[in-house]
């Protein structure tokens, strides 16, 4: 299984739009937390990101499966909010979320609040890898980027990755920023083993067998041989017959079945043969399970908030969270705006 990403300028623009999973406001049916009625603040701005990733009771068996996830030559000279997720394997969870809030000049006594909360839990998962290489790489990418950048690259199984940003700005004198992350991983089972490498070999067999046989031949019943005058049968007239039963002179009935002819025999049996063919055989072991995660020639000349997660293997949990709150006691009319 292979996942590769090369972003075009159009894809960059779409990623910048689609990666915003929560926006502080009243549109779309989402409502931010209500202000405290006991507070003396007349207004404010709130940005909140709450994320939960759960991965449990799954079972995956890989036999020689190749999982390669890579980002190469992409996300260059981008600005704004950019989120990229690349995964290869099974049951991987990735997300990039941003929440932005800005209060105008009328909320001069308000408070700017930004917070992120991330919960990742993985339990009861079973992973069996047999000669299964996992490779995750970020190469020559995300250079000269400014703004908020989140990149997740995972190869394998049951990996959880998060990049979250919450930012709020207000003309109020107070600002609050909070960030919380919880990751739990219990009751998981991972088995990494090398798989057999099967082949075949040509075989040639020769067979030589010796044996012997011993037995007795006996006449059963009375037999009478006819005699004729002519040279051919039935040429001429019948002159009589010859008795070969037990009543003949000197005859003996060997097996007491009425016959007088008995022969003892003895012989040898000689068996020879050649067998050849092709049979399967175990000729060794394939390459054992290998997990490679690499970052090369990337993230150069970057400014702003950058979160990058690269994971190879199984059951990895990664999170990058940032909360920014800006308040101002002497801002000009119109307030400030965030540069994202």
Curated annotation (Swiss-Prot):
Species whose genome carries this gene: Pseudomonas aeruginosa (strain ATCC 15692 / DSM 22644 / CIP 104116 / JCM 14847 / LMG 12228 / 1C / PRS 101 / PAO1)
Keyword Nucleotide-binding in annotation: no
A GO term from the CC aspect: extracellular region
Region (Linker 2): 168-290
UniProt motif Cys-X-X-Cys: location: 328-331
Complex and partners: The major component of purified amyloid fibrils. Fibrils are resistant to boiling in 2% (weight/vol) SDS and require >90% (vol/vol) formic acid to dissolve. Interacts with FapA in vitro.
Signal peptide segment: 1-24
Family: Belongs to the FapB/FapC family.
Keywords: Amyloid, Cell adhesion, Fimbrium, Repeat, Secreted, Signal
Disruption phenotype annotation: Deletion of the entire fapA-fapF six-gene locus shows no visible growth phenotype.
Subcellular location(s) per record: Fimbrium; Secreted
Superkingdom of origin: Bacteria
GO biological process, one term: cell adhesion
Annotated spans, Linker 1: 101-133
Keyword Repeat included in the entry's annotation: yes
Predominant subcellular localization, coarse grouping: other
Record field: transmembrane: none
FapC_R repeat start and end residues: 67-100, 134-167, 291-324
Function: The major functional amyloid subunit in this bacterium. Upon overexpression of the endogenous six-gene locus (fapA-fapF), cells form large clumps during liquid growth, make large amounts of biofilm and produce amyloid fibrils.
Protein name: Functional amyloid subunit FapC
Gene that encodes it: fapC
